[in-house]
């Protein structure tokens, strides 16, 4: 019997996206170009987080393969992702979020 069940398996780099509401003035002060993404080192990350220290960020799973898998899960496709996840708060947040999106 032929297996007709659809599933998707992705391998990628799990990341955590921190989402913070910012004004155009905030972006100018921080030297950030609107509508872009940039990986930053720990020093730059601390600088940006310190600037927004009074605003609680929202955390979302990121990375191109994991984002694709999350989208597939949202379409009702059995979806799985593999990647190295740290044993820290961000790793816990990541696992919690992808499970809520229905990813295995």
Can you name each region flagged by the protein language model?
Residues 84-85, 97:
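"Short basic amphipathic alpha-helical interaction patches in structured regions
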Residues 1-82, 89-93:
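Glycine-rich phosphate/adenosyl-contacting loop at the front of the ribokinase-like
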Residues 97-104:
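A glycine-rich helix N-cap at a beta->alpha junction
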């Amino acid at each position: 019997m032929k297996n007709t069940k659809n599933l998707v398996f992705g391998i990628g780099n799990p990341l955590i996206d921190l989402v913070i509401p910012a004004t155009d003035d905030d972006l100018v002060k921080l030297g950030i170009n609107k509508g872009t993404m940039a990986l930053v080192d720990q020093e730059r990350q601390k600088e940006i987080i310190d600037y927004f220290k009074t605003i609680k960020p929202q955390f979302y799973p990121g990375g191109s393969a994991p984002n694709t898998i999350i989208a597939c899960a949202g379409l009702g496709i059995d979806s799985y992702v593999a990647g190295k996840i740290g044993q820290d708060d961000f790793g816990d947040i990541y696992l919690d979020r992808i499970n809520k999106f229905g990813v295995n």
